[in-house]
Amino acid sequence: MALGPGRFSVEPTRERPDSPPRSYGVPRRGGTFIEWAHVIERLTTSEGYWIGTVTPGGRPHVVPIWGCFVGDDLYLETGAPDTIKNRNLARNPNVWIHLDDVNDAVMVRGRGVELRSLDRELGEALASAMSGKYKGYDPTPDSWDNGGMWRIEPETVLAWKAMPTSTRWRFDKPG
């Protein structure tokens, strides 16, 4: 898989979420939106990510993990193939990703695509990004040849700083 324009490279359709009650004061049209560039900056600079997966019994499993942005795509490192999160993703690739800050919230709903035997260019880019972001961590380009690295294909992104800035972006289905 070579580097190229990723799923996050083009701003998806922006709209208001359906869920806030009218009493929250979120306008149905117009008003203040979060800018897509802000979402990309938050996803790129975040120290860590929380990933929510689904167990075989349908229960949520949420854990913090490391990740990075490379070539307009979000990549998340999930550790050894036998971890709960990896087993969950292998069975059901649906995920929710969110960042720590409740006052500057960014959440991504999508699907994980496991990467194995990465081409040299992507392996080098991921190893460089991860070692640059996480001090003391020094992966090699082939560190994920047996699994443990997932590219996130976003379907919906939600973000808000405060009411009434709730913003939702919807991506076109790939293919």
Predicted regions and their residues:
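Generic structural signal for secondary-structure transition and capping sites
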Residues: 47-48, 94, 135, 157
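Short, basic/aromatic recognition patches
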Residues: 22-50
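A generic local structural motif
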Residues: 35-38, 62-63, 82, 137-138
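Phosphate-coordinating loops and pocket residues in cytosolic domains that bind phosphorylated ligands
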Residues: 91
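Short beta-strand segments
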Residues: 46-81, 87, 95-99, 107-111
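Tryptophan-centered motif/residue detector
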Residues: 36, 50, 66-69, 160, ...
